[in-house]
Structures are given as C-alpha cells and as structure tokens.
Amino acid sequence: MARSFGANSTVVLAIIFFGCLFAFSTAKEEATKLGSVIGIDLGTTYSCVGVYKNGHVEIIANDQGNRITPSWVGFTDSERLIGEAAKNQAAVNPERTVFDVKRLIGRKFEDKEVQKDRKLVPYQIVNKDGKPYIQVKIKDGETKVFSPEEISAMILTKMKETAEAYLGKKIKDAVVTVPAYFNDAQRQATKDAGVIAGLNVARIINEPTAAAIAYGLDKKGGEKNILVFDLGGGTFDVSVLTIDNGVFEVLSTNGDTHLGGEDFDHRIMEYFIKLIKKKHQKDISKDNKALGKLRRECERAKRALSSQHQVRVEIESLFDGVDLSEPLTRARFEELNNDLFRKTMGPVKKAMDDAGLQKSQIDEIVLVGGSTRIPKVQQLLKDFFEGKEPNKGVNPDEAVAYGAAVQGGILSGEGGDETKDILLLDVAPLTLGIETVGGVMTKLIPRNTVIPTKKSQVFTTYQDQQTTVSIQVFEGERSLTKDCRLLGKFDLTGVPPAPRGTPQIEVTFEVDANGILNVKAEDKASGKSEKITITNEKGRLSQEEIDRMVKEAEEFAEEDKKVKEKIDARNALETYVYNMKNQVSDKDKLADKLEGDEKEKIEAATKEALEWLDENQNSEKEEYDEKLKEVEAVCNPIITAVYQRSGGAPGAGGESSTEEEDESHDEL
C-alpha cells in the first residue's frame, strides 16, 4: 500500500552535521591557504594547545610553565586576567571571576541546566534575548554583559598567544575541539568564539575522536575496536571507534554535556556546607568569598583522593570566625558521588548497543579527561567490561589537544609520513527520515551513520493533478514529524498533472565532508528538479532536546507504533476507496463493464466512505479496518462478477489491473 505526501506534506530528512571530520577532505587544497594550524582543546575547566612540528606534536606550556591553562577569566578594577592569574584571585574576587562558561555556550537561558548553574556560580548569569549572558563589573566599576562566546574567545586568545610565543610568529588558524555530543548551536557558538578571538577555525573536531588519534597514531597492524571514555571537568562523552592502519571510523557516540568533575566538586561542597551548619550553626551558602575558598579546597581534595585514601580539608578564617579543618576519605567522596559515577555507565551501554559490539570485542578502553583518574570511575568501567583494565597510555589532560594538533598538521600540509594515511570518519548522531501521509516520519538513515552519505528514494503524489510537491527536511528519532525537528523546506513545482500515484519523484539526500546537506527532488518524467542546501543552522537542538528525543522515543515507542498503525489503516481505507472511485469512472477500466445498479452501489459506498473519513479524522485503527471491510463487502463481489463476465481475473482488493509496476512508491 503506497503512502503519500499530503498537499503540505514533505520529504523530510534528518541529518546531523556534528563533527564531519575528514582529514582527507581537501587537505592539500586547504594547505595552500593555511599557515601553521594549532590544535586547541577548549575545556570546561582547563584548556590545552598543541602544534604539529618537525614530525611530532608539541604540547605548548603557558607563561607559567604549565601545559594546561585554567579556563577562567577575572576582572579587577585595573585589568582582565586569564588562566592561572584569574583562578588564583577568585577567592577574593568571586563575583568578577568567570569559569565553567562551556556549560553555557550555545544554550538557551531557560535551559534547566543553565538555571541549575546560576545557583552554583558566584557571578551573575542574566537573560539577554533568550540567551545566558554573564554580567560583571569591569575596570572603573563599569558593569558589562558578556556572551559565553566572548568569554570563550578570551580563553582561546590566551591559547593562541601561548602558541605564538612558542612558535615566534602570528597564528591565524586553529582546529578546536568540542564534546562529541555537542549540538549544532553549541558548535556554531564555539566557532563564533574563535572568530572573536581572531582565529579561523579550520575544523571543529570531536574530543573523543581527537583522543583516539592520540592513542592510535603510532598503532600499526590490524583492526582494533576502541572505546574512548572522556570524562572531563564539565562534559562526558563515549565514542566507539574502529582503528585500522590510520583509518579512524566512529561507530557510535553518546554522552552528557553536563556531567563532569565540577559536579563532583559541588557534591563535596554541599557536604561541607551541611557539616559547617551542623557543627557551627553557620550558613555559608550565600557567601561567595567563603564558597570560592571552599570550591578551591574541594577540587584540591578531590584530586588528592585519586592517589590517597584520606585528605584533610583545611581553610583558615573560612567564614565569620570559623576555621575549617575536617578529614575527607575516599570512601566518603565515592559515596557522595556514587549516583553520578554510575550515571556514566548508561552512555557506555548505549554506545556499545549502537555500535553493535559485545563487551569482549572491545580491544582497548582509552581514558581521557582529568576525572578518569578517579579510582571508582576506573573500577566501574573495569567491572562493566568484566575485568578488562582501561588503557592509561595517553595523557588524559593532553590527548585531545594532541589529536587536534595532528589534524591541524594535516590541514596545514605540515604533517609527514606519520599522518599521511590518517582518515577520520565521524557520524551523524540523529536519524534522517522522510514524511509520508499522516505526518509519518519514514526513517531512511539511522543515527550513528558514517558521513558523508547519499541516499535516494522514489516517491509519488497524493492528490490527482498535483503539480507541486513540498519537500521538507527533518531530524529526529520519533515516528511522527511533529515530534522531530524541521531543518528546511522547498517546493518542486511544474510536476505534469496526472492521477495520484502516477508521477515518480526521486528525492536525494547528500551530506558532504564539511557537514553541508544537499537535498534534491527530481520529477523523473519531465526531468524538472529543485534542490536546497542546508548549512549548519543556528538555534539547533539543545542537548536537553536531543536527550528528550531519544528518551521519548524509547518511552513512547509503543505509543508511536499505535499512532503509525492508525495512520496506515486510514491510508489503506482511503487508497482503496479512491482506487474504486477511479475504476468506476474510467472507461479503460470498469466504467463500461458495470451494469447500472452495480455502478450506483459502488459510487454510493465510496461516497459514504469518503464522507465518513471527513467526519472521522482521528478514529482508532480498528474503526478504519472495520470501515474498509464494509466497503470491500460491497465492492469486491461486484468486481469479481465483472471480471467473470469478461473472462478475466479479478484485481486484488480492487487494485487497478493495468498497473504495470508491482513496486509501490511512498506518496508525497
């Protein structure tokens, strides 16, 4: 039974452009335009920069001699501070010191994660045009609001200057990393931050993919399946990849863009806030200076507990004459964060399921991000993989910048034999599909499909004499397009008038190596075609929306199935009725073969059925099935009698016997 496009219906496609990172794509071409291309890991809590030089990657130390730089920006009455200088003065200047801005970038102000963060940071997050902005006093007491992109740009500028000091020349081009589960709005905002920092962001690369390069660059030989577990200061990613002689193919990705070391710090802080209240009857939760001191000590304690079983948290003159001196054991730390640690296993399972691999098929578990030093996290991962030890061969703080620098070397043409065979194949995290009659999202390309990709399918019209078909492009996991996201639309006009179901319209979806989507529709009879290019649009899905789509798809799978069955039942009835109506009015079919009362009976039955359909737009599947049986009970005996009189075989279910093709096409 053919499905169809309604008058306003669409061919829809869901495509994600996240991280279409192909090292081979126009590398030589770009190299002629680019100078040295640095690799920057723009992290929630720390950032890192590297460059590919003289056949290997150099991770560049900052002016303090450190290879990682705090992603902090501070404002005083006289200057702006970035990195260690900003973090070191945060306790005495909390309201004017900004950190964790990666948790705001590309998000909407009303996002629940943003609202949660507003309560946890000492600086002011305000609403400007629906986006979260940071309001601080800068020099001379002037109040200013900054977008998250502007603050990120300040950190990128610091990394750029660090590289320039080392290389002794100006740098204009960079590869910047983002979490694999960042959505397009977050990616676009990151690119914008690069522009503000005076950088051409030559490529956005996914953090786990970059880390996989760091792990696999020198690995020769046969195919290996690796799982990259990337738990940083503010975000969490899991990617499953296959590495085979320089080809890095991402099989699946999953994650949480709001889970990391900062959350573990907050749990320790909450514990001590309650302890101080109980012991000293003092509430420090509203005092930003006290919280700043506590935050710094809690982070230090957390780090120490990765190698020690107990630490002492000591802060003199914390608040109102109270000195804090309390022990914190590793066991207590693990208990405080137990649910968060266990939460990381969900995306691991989903990524494994999507990759279609068994636990025993993973050859290496690669740990990335400072939070993977936590023994409990390593133990949970080891238990999940039934005793397999995670690989600790890459530096968890530097691996992402290392991979980004390799990609930069390829793009600049400075890569040598070590990089010449590297090929990165990343994936689209959401399903692509087309809409057919009733708003059904017909899924074409599943999430985690390797891109670039191309898919064509033939559709037909829903109405008689339909000359225009509306093509709309969607993304999402649900069964109906109303629950998916529209990316763009266009019309194919000039389709020659014909009965419904006759025209053949070929729709082609193609995503190139740069993540740009092209959709083309062509009428095969006339050769008339139209196409649309959808670049990464701003205001795309927030991570919350992506998570909601997948979660709802799981929760409402049964409900979606029922709705789809109902639409299919309605379409079956409608198609049968229109077929009968056309046959009794077409002289080449049944019109001249029917006796007067037979024709009247069929016309009355089809007329009554169409009126019933108009009045029963939202009936249940069973009602449509019952109505179809009623119409068939009237029409089928008459059709059988006609064919017996003419010596032919009856058309099954009243289908046209002149139909040449068995293959049915979805209708547009």
UniProtKB/Swiss-Prot annotation:
InterPro entries: ATPase_NBD (IPR043129), BIP_NBD (IPR042050), Heat_shock_70_CS (IPR018181), HSP70_C_sf (IPR029048), HSP70_peptide-bd_sf (IPR029047), Hsp_70_fam (IPR013126). Residues 1-23 form the signal peptide. A motif (Prevents secretion from ER) lies at residues 665-668. Disruption phenotype: Bip1 and bip2 double mutation affects the fusion of polar nuclei during female gametophyte development. Bip1 and bip2 double mutation affects pollen tube growth and length. Bip1, bip2 and bip3 triple mutation is pollen lethal. Bip1, bip2 and bip3 triple mutation affects female gametophyte development during the early stages. GO terms for biological process: response to endoplasmic reticulum stress. It is found in: Endoplasmic reticulum lumen; Nucleus. SUPFAM superfamilies: Actin-like ATPase domain, Heat shock protein 70kD (HSP70), C-terminal subdomain, Heat shock protein 70kD (HSP70), peptide-binding domain. Induction: Induced by heat shock and sugar. Up-regulated by light, DTT and tunicamycin treatment. Keywords: ATP-binding, Chaperone, Endoplasmic reticulum, Nucleotide-binding, Nucleus, Signal, Transcription, Transcription regulation. The keyword Metal-binding does not apply. Residues 657-668 have a biased composition (Acidic residues). Residues 643-668 are annotated as: Disordered. Pfam families: HSP70. GO terms for cellular component: endoplasmic reticulum; endoplasmic reticulum lumen; mediator complex; nucleolus; nucleus; plant-type cell wall; plant-type vacuole; plasmodesma. Expressed in mature pollen grains, and pollen tubes. CDD domains: ASKHA_NBD_HSP70_BiP. GO terms for molecular function: ATP binding; ATP-dependent protein folding chaperone. PANTHER family: HEAT SHOCK PROTEIN 70KDA. Belongs to the heat shock protein 70 (TC 1.A.33) family. DnaK subfamily. Interacts with BAG7. In cooperation with other chaperones, Hsp70s are key components that facilitate folding of de novo synthesized proteins, assist translocation of precursor proteins into organelles, and are responsible for degradation of damaged protein under stress conditions. Involved in polar nuclei fusion during female gametophyte development and is essential for the regulation of endosperm nuclei proliferation. Involved in sperm nuclear fusion with central cell polar nuclei at fertilization, which is critical for normal endosperm nuclear proliferation. This is Heat shock 70 kDa protein BIP2. The gene is BIP2.
